[in-house]
Amino acid sequence: MAFFIASSPHAHNRRSTPDLMKWVAICALPGLLAQTYFFGWGTLIQLVFAIALAVTFEAAVMLLRKRPPVMALRDYSAVVTAWLLSVAIPPHSPWWILVIGMFFAIVIAKHLYGGLGQNPFNPAMVAYVVLLISFPVQMTSWNAPASLTAEATSFVDSFLMIFTGFNNEGLSLQQARLGIDGTTMATPLDAFKTALTAGNTASEALSQPQFSWLAGVGWEWVNLAYLIGGLVLIKQRVIQWHIPVAFLGSLTLFSLMFLMFTPGETASPTIHLLSGATMLGAFFIATDPVSASTTVKGRLVFGALIGGLVFIIRSWGGFPDGVAFAVLLANMCVPLIDYYTKPRTYGH
């Protein structure tokens, strides 16, 4: 019998980086379709434009680094980054928002650190935070869900609003943002925080039309869609369960604790879990294998830290949704988390 001598590793995982990225995109489809249904065609238009920008910036940087662009484009990591950023911004954000955002995501947050596998921060969240701090008006002008508008925004109007700033009737983005055409309004989390700041109780804040019996109108279905996609990712072993479970468990625990002691000032766990970018963050953003913790215990700590930070920022921060800030702050703690949670070497 002939024996073959080969060097380690002897066990191989057939899944490559492109395969994993494809699974992430496929499982994000339910959330994308839900967002498109409730918030209009602008979501799909932004996605296509973001992917085109991501591919362009990725190829340009690879050429500047004197490396073949095809190799970088084949892993689809730029496409996933574009996907995550495009669904995180308002559907009718002006086109230059994505240009700036994708530049920061691909060129600064990814390739400035050495490319895929070297970036300490999630590129999409770096871009989102830069945009949110620099252009708060454009980044907080969300459409009202389709069920709360008299007439849904057409594909042509969405396209024109993004690339010209005016819809087919000549209304500017600023006019739409002020509610003249009734197509834009604050997100449920923003409306809840504004109502509390104005002196209303939590129950009074939740009586606004942005909220249903479960959570924010439209947003609850978007989050449930991302939850379904996230569970498929876990079942397919594309991601592990530790970070999402710790994230959602920590957020639920904090909201329950404060709901018990300050019921008039705290949103219920369902509001926190099914509003904003909670499920998108738990399953598709925080689980980034490059910028997340690598040890089993570390992933639990990492996820719990994000969940706690999300609750703190939503409750007392200056922004209604804190997922992006929480993820970046947790990314900063990853080296420390991994150092103290690494398994002991046998015999030491």
UniProtKB/Swiss-Prot annotation:
- GO biological process per UniProt: electron transport chain; transmembrane transport
Q: Does the keyword Transmembrane apply?
A: yes
Required co-factors = FMN
Record-level GO cellular component terms: plasma membrane
Q: Tell me yes or no: is Flavoprotein among this UniProt entry's keywords.
A: yes
Q: What is its main location?
A: membrane
Cite the entry's keywords alphabetically. Answer: Cell inner membrane, Cell membrane, Electron transport, Flavoprotein, FMN, Membrane, Phosphoprotein, Translocase, Transmembrane, Transmembrane helix, Transport
Topology relative to the lipid bilayer, per the entry, is:
Multi-pass membrane protein
The family note in this entry says: Belongs to the NqrB/RnfD family.
Q: Which NCBIfam families match?
A: PRK00816.1, rnfD
PANTHER family found in the cross-reference section: ELECTRON TRANSPORT COMPLEX PROTEIN RNFD, ION-TRANSLOCATING OXIDOREDUCTASE COMPLEX SUBUNIT D
Protein name listed in UniProt: Ion-translocating oxidoreductase complex subunit D
Q: Name its species.
A: Vibrio atlanticus (strain LGP32)
Gene name tied to this protein: rnfD
